[in-house]
Each structure stands twice: as C-alpha cells, then as structure tokens.
Design a protein with these regions (language model features):
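Conserved mixed alpha/beta core segments that line enzyme active sites in large multi-domain catalysts
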Residues: 47-77, 143, 243-244, 261-330
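Glycine/proline-enriched, intrinsically flexible loops and inter-domain linkers
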Residues: 4-5, 23, 63, 182, ...
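A carboxyl-terminal module marker
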Residues: 20, 27, 446-449, 467, ...
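Mobile "lid/hinge" segments at catalytic clefts and subdomain interfaces of large enzymes
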Residues: 110-123, 130-135, 146-151, 155, ...
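Extended, well-folded interaction surfaces typified by the phenylalanyl-tRNA synthetase beta subunit core
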Residues: 420-589, 723, 776-778, 788-810
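Short, hydrophobic beta-strand segments
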Residues: 2-8, 154-162, 222-230, 364-372, ...
Length: 810
C-alpha cells in the first residue's frame, strides 16, 4: 500500500519524520518497504503561461510559442498539439536537468530559436504516457518552481499489509493506525449526506431514480447502496490533484468517473463501481450466482466462463459484472456517458475469496473484499464519491437507495462485529508487562475498541473480566489473544522485557537407525548438488503429464492456477526450477530437495529427489565437456550406501515408469524392496518442456535409508588372489543378475567382484555380449591354493550357466 505523506496529513498529522513514522509502523505490524519522492529528481522547471502560439514557418507540426514566467517573456518551439494561448504549463528553462540526466540548452529548431522546453508529464516522470504538455490550473503562480507547486518532494511510504488486516488497505485505515500509535487527532474528508437533486455544473435535468435492485444471493450480498447521477460530463479530464494522487498511489487516470471510484478505494478502502445507466437492460439489477453456460466480458478485455459458485451482478440480458472482482464492458462508462448509477455493495468475504484468482484476476476490489470490508462504510463512501463527482464532473444527484436483507431480529443481515471478553490479568501474563485494567481500556479505545462491560479501575480483582466491542472494520478481532496483540502493538513490542525461558526443554531421542537429515543433505552438497525448496503445490498440467491418471489433492483456493494441486512427487517442482535456471543461462544444474509428497488416500511420504541437467563436470580446461548420464546419477546415489553403513546397499533394477525414458530408467531397491526411481526424463517431455538435453531424475523414500551399523571383521594376514572371467551373456542380462549368481555360488572366500570390460563384436553372437569380471579371493586363516581357487571358479561358472545361460571365453 503506497501512502503519500501529504494525503496522510489530510487525515492525521503524526508529528514524525517519514523514516520515524515508517519505523514505528513497522514495529506495529506494517512493514515499511520503501520511501521515495513523489517524482524523480529534476530541477529548473517552472510554471509558465503561453501568451501566443503560432505555426512554425518551416514545420507544420511545430508551434512557436511566446511564454511568460512572470517578469520575463521567452520564445519556445513546441510540438505538442495542446499548446495554446492562455494555458499554464511546465517550462524547463535553459540549464534545467530533467529525469534521465537530460540537460536543457538553448537550441535552434528549423531555424527558430528556442529558449527552453515545454514539458509533458512523461518527460517529467509524472506519467508513463502523455498526449501533450502538462496542463496546470490557471491559479498557479507564474515562475513558481514546479516541484513546490505540485509538492513533488512529497514522501511516498510503501507498507506491506498482512492478509488479516484488510482494514488497513486504505489511507483511512493507515491513518487510524497512525492516530492510535501517536495519539494524534484523527480527521477525514467531508462525507455528510448530499440531498437528492443537488445542482451541479449543468442544472436543469431532473434527478432520476436508480435501477431496481434485487438480492437473490442475500447471504453473499446482504446490502447494496446505489445512487444515480445525471448530466455528468465524463469527457473532461480529471483535475491535476486527482490525477496526481492516483499516480502516487500507483494508478493511472482514465476518466473522472472511473478516477473517483478508484480514489474512494484508495482513500476509504471501499470498492465501488459505476454503471452507464442507459446500458442496463430492463432497468433492473440482480445480485445472484452465475447460471450454467453464462459468461461475462470483463473490463480488461477478457471473456470468462462463469462457474455456478461465482457471484455476479446481472441485468435482464445476463451478467454485467463479476461481483467484488471486476465490472463488465457492456455497462461500462465512456466519455459519452451522462447518466451514471453508482454501486457500493457489501459482499461476504467467503463469497469472493478465490473467485478472481481462478480466472487469473487479482484486483484492488477482490483483495479488499476477500479480507473483509467494513459493512458500515457503504453510505459514507457513496456520499464522498458523490461530492467528488459533483466537484469534478458536475451533474445532478438522485437519492441514495439501499437494498438489504433483514435478519430475523429486524437488523440488517450484514456481518456483526463480535464482542470479546478479556481478562486483564492475562494481558500481563502473556506479555510479561504490568498492565492495569484502565490502561488496557485506554489503549484499546484508541483503536475504537470500546469497553461495554466490566470494571476497569486500577485495583480491579484478579479474576475480573472486561468485555469489548470489536469495531465493524476489524475482521481480525474475535478472541482474547487478538485484544492482547493490539495492546502489545500500541505499547510497542520493543517495550516488552526480554526474560530468559525457564521451562524444561526435553530433547527427544533420535532412533539410532534413523538417518540424520543433515548428514543426508551434506552428502549431496559435497557431491556438487545444490539444495532447493519448492512449493508443495504444483502445476496440475505438468503433474498430469508426468503421472497420467493418478489422482491429486486439489486446492479449493490456490494462490495461482499453476499451483493448484498438491504434489505427488518432488519432480514437478524440480523440473520447473531447472527450467527457470536454464532461462537464466545456467547451463549445468544439480538440484536436490528433501520434502514430503501427498498421495491421495495415504499418509504423507518423506522423499529425497533431484534433477541434473548439463555436463558431467563443471567446464574446465583439462578435459572436454561430456554430458552427464545415468551412471553419473547412479554413482551419486550409491554413495548413500556408504552413508547408511551398507556400501552397495542400493540396487538398480531395469524397469519402466511412464515419465522416464523406457530404456534409461531403473527402479531403486534396498534389501529387495522398491524405494524409488532413477533415470532420464522421457524424450516426449524433454521436447515439450524445452530442455536442451534430457534431465536426469531420481526420487526415493527417506524412511528406507535406515542406518545399518557395520560389524567388525578382522583383516586377513594372507594374500589376495585375482582371477578374471569372461562371461558371454544375453544382451539384456544385467550386472546385478551376474553379481547375484556369482555371490550366491561362492563359499565365502570371494571378497570383491567388478567389471573391467564389456565386448561386442567379432566372435560374439548377435544379441549377446562378453562381460569381463575381476574376482578377488582371500581366506582369513590360510593362503589359498590353486585347487581351492579352481573349485570356486568351477562353482561360479556352473551357477552362471544354470541361472543365465552363460558361456565363457578363454
């Protein structure tokens, strides 16, 4: 929320410098994000009046203007279409410096001398686009410094508003906080009722009755203020003060009617909408939920297909607005609009929450209605808007009409602020401060939280309670702790003494078989991987591509359409992160993540996953760059075996998973039980996701990585013997099957088996391969003899022949 100091001082004078005020607000829960001036730096720009404007003798699109800055007349060549005699505007004199370090010098344009430049709002950094030179009010003094005239050194404070404080998303809301924190008096603009048929700029037309309004969805919209203004001049530009305030708050000027409705949102926090009364079909509006097949053409140019739970405002021809989110084009105001119907409605937060984001819409209105708008603010807002419209665009007003749903007790069915009970003793216990009850009452009253029951004298009994009425604009005050928080904010969190904790803090024992998370993370970090932390909710489209047909938990109110389901795997988040890194020219990526996944119908599962893209090693001079492959990934995973005390404890079994390359993927096993997957991303998704090469992926259950402590084994004093064996096998045979056959047939003298060559070619049948094994034998008790070794080798050959149909090369 951007807050100009000049606008704030129209409500309350804090008596603090901007930085001091920002620090005080930060400690009260409204973090100061930035302080800036209302305009970029420039100098030497003054107010000037154009005395005459003649066509340039050498250029049709230029004018030669004679301008006055008070006691001096100057000749300026200008190309703006709106340059005309009598206009007061901004003149950059010779020697002036404009934004972007543009220095103004005397110049000759097409043979005519020009002693400066008449400036547009864009050239002064006051607008992104502009149609001509700046037009200033006729009453501003000639020769005055423009920065002083427009107060362009006005500090702009930008605050972060937390989701629970929708009431602070306005100048009024922040002014209330400033007044409460500083003790300064709170003022505000004139919001007194304006009677019907008040004459404005063009008297003579009768005030007309508003369109009829009905509330079919009364629980979602129990109150609807509306009023008609006729003979409005919406073609004139908004006054400079209004355009400037909108600009400083981060909005652009559109037209007087739209500007004023936007101004009310910023000033009071009440979203409102203006309809062209002549475009409302049937002369009536109804607030209801959308019907099947309905759509709405919105002001931003989009057409949305409306779901049945979307609240709309409709006329006889169908929806004209998404209630609380955005208006529609069909009834929008234009420069030709002369009859306007103003709407100030109260929508229940639950009826608006998430509806806009479902369609990719986040508007000023939806942000406020989702958090909760003061149900008692509507009348003040419509009166304030009416007064501004009469001032800016003229016209005649009709009466304010209110359509509302009445509860059984005869009161309006809008939200009723709750009463909250507070134990004064609890304030001291929670905050660690001595706080007499009368002090608590005084602090809360600054926030319009009034005591309605109980005794607040300093010596009140320990067990006594006080009851407070929560103000209608505070949706976040419902329980005792909320009141205690308000007391803490006003006293200042920095005033709460620091007291060392005295509670016993038992430390839970960690099972010896459980792998410490930090050791797991350190292992991958030491092998060149970088840890990532990603959202637990992911893109439903990407997740369906990777795991087609697998159900996911869908969020009812996602923060974005591409973060709408809970993840079934760590891979969607890792792949998105890899894409973002590649877009930022990171050619070699090694990302891993430790987190939980959320299968439907099962508990959360703790997983470790990773993605690798690019070269095997970082680029270097000593060797050519080679892409990483499955075996590089496998080597990193096998290092986990040593971490859990079981070198080689992870097995890799050839298997297929839909999202992985069918010939370059494996199921990961531990002790014969599946614990994860590893492999290349399927070529289809490599292409569709735009990867330059196939990413390598792995994921496994952390719970399977239990630690097995090694058992002491005495080192043999006797020599090792090596024998090599060339085994001819079917092409599809795996090393794990060979290893299994060798180890099961050995008597226990075999210490190590490894592959040192694989051969295909002359002398080997098609469809078969020769795998050369190195076999290391050793006995603990004696030196091995040839007879013993030959017996071992014979047993191994027999086992491989029987199990794998192997033959042997000499």
């Amino acid at each position: 929320m951007k807050l100009p100091m000049s606008w704030l001082k129209g409500w309350v004078d804090p008596g603090l410098a901007p930085r001091e005020l920002g620090d005080r607000m930060t400690l009260a829960g409204f973090e100061l994000e930035s302080i800036a001036s209302a305009a970029p730096a420039f100098s030497g720009v003054v107010v000037a009046e154009i005395l005459s404007a003649e066509r340039h003798p050498q250029a049709d699109k230029l004018q030669v203007c004679r301008v006055s800055i008070g006691g001096t007349e100057l000749q300026i060549v200008c190309g703006a279409a709106n340059a005309r005699a009598g206009l007061r505007t901004a003149l950059a004199q010779v020697g002036a410096v404009l934004p972007g370090d543009l220095k103004i010098k005397a110049a000759k344009l097409r043979g005519v001398e020009s002693a400066g430049m008449l400036c547009s709002a864009k050239e002064l950094g006051l607008a992104e686009v502009s149609d001509g030179i700046l037009e200033l009010p006729a009453e501003v003094a000639l020769g005055a410094d423009l920065r002083a005239v427009l107060d362009l050194d006005d500090p702009l404070l930008e605050f972060a508003i937390t989701p629970n404080r929708g009431d602070a998303m306005s100048v009024q809301g922040l002014a209330r906080e400033v007044a409460a924190l500083t003790g300064a008096a709170l003022g505000g603009p004139d919001c007194e009722p304006i009677p019907a048929a008040v004459e404005g700029a063009s008297a003579g037309s009768p005030a007309q009755k508003s369109a009829a309004v009905s509330l079919s969805a009364g629980s979602a919209c129990p109150r609807f203020h509306h009023r008609v203004l006729v003979d409005i001049d919406n073609a004139r530009p908004s006054p400079l003060w209004l355009r400037e305030r909108l600009r400083r708050a981060g909005q652009r000027s559109i037209s007087p009617i739209v500007d004023i409705t936007n101004y009310i949102v910023l000033e009071l926090g009440q979203p409102m909408h203006a309809y062209d009364l002549d475009k409302i079909e049937g002369g009536a509006l109804d607030v209801r939920f959308a019907r099947g097949g309905e759509s709405c053409d919105l002001l931003d140019g989009r057409t949305v297909e409306l779901a049945p739970d979307v609240l709309v405002i409709a006329d006889a021809a169908g929806p004209v607005a998404m209630a609380g989110v955005m208006g529609g084009v069909r009834t929008s105001v234009t420069p030709e609009t002369t009859r306007v119907m103003l709407e100030v409605a109260w929508f229940a937060p639950a009826a608006i929450a998430g509806r806009g984001r479902r369609y990719g819409l986040t508007t000023d209105a939806s942000q406020r209605f989702e958090r909760g708008v003061d149900p008692e603010l509507g009348r003040r807002a419509i009166e304030r808007a009416t007064r501004l419209m009469l001032e800016v665009a003229g016209g005649i007003v009709g009466a304010v009409e209110v359509t509302e749903v009445v509860a059984e007790d005869g009161a309006a069915a809008v939200r009723r602020a709750p009463r909250v009970t507070l134990r004064p003793a609890e304030v001291g216990r929670v905050l660690g401060l001595e706080m007499p009850p009368d002090r608590v009452v005084e602090l809360l009253s600054r926030l319009d939280i009034q005591q309605v029951d109980g005794t607040a004298h300093p010596a009140a009994a320990v067990g006594e309670t006080l009851t407070f009425q929560s103000p209608s604009h505070r949706f976040d005050i419902t329980i005792e702790r909320d009141l205690i928080e308000e007391v803490a904010r006003l006293v200042g969190f920095e005033a709460i003494p620091v007291i060392d904790a005295r509670a016993v803090q038992p430390i839970r024992a960690l099972p010896t078989s459980q792998l410490e998370e930090q050791r797991l993370l350190d292992l991958f970090a030491s092998r060149g991987w970088q840890e990532g932390v990603h959202f637990s909710f992911v893109d439903p489209v990407l997740q369906e591509q990777l795991f087609p047909g697998v159900p996911s938990h869908r969020l009812s109110n996602p923060i974005a359409s591409d973060l709408a389901v809970m993840r079934l795997s760590l891979w969607p988040g890792l792949l998105r992160a890899a894409q973002e890194n590649l877009r930022r020219q990171q050619g070699r990526i090694r990302l891993f993540e430790h987190g939980v996944v959320f299968p439907v119908g099962a508990p959360e599962i703790d997983r470790l996953g990773g993605v690798a893209v690019g070269g095997r090693r970082p680029e270097q001079w000593g060797e050519d760059e080679a892409p990483a492959d499955f075996y590089d990934l496998r080597a990193d995973l096998e290092a986990l075996g040593g971490l859990v005390g079981q070198a080689g404890g992870l097995e890799f079994e050839r298997a297929s998973l839909g999202c992985l390359h069918p010939g370059r993927s494996a199921r990961i096993l531990r002790n014969g039980r599946p614990v994860g997957w590893a492999g290349e991303l399927h070529p289809r998704w490599v292409r569709e996701l735009g990867f330059p090469s196939a990413p390598l992926l792995f994921e496994l259950d952390v719970a399977a990585l239990t630690v097995e402590y090694p058992v002491f084994a005495e080192v043999s004093r006797f020599p090792q013997l090596r024998r090599d064996l060339a085994v001819v096998l079917a092409e599809e045979a795996t090393f794990s099957s060979v290893l299994e056959g060798v180890t099961l047939s050995s008597s226990g003298l075999l210490r190590h088996v490894f592959v040192f060559d694989v051969y295909r070619g002359m002398g080997i049948e098609t469809g078969r391969k020769s795998v050369a094994l190195g076999l290391i034998f050793q006995d603990k008790n004696s030196t091995l003899t040839e007879e013993v070794i030959e017996g071992e080798m014979a047993a191994i050959r027999a086992a491989l022949t029987l199990r794998l149909g192997a033959s042997f090369r000499e």
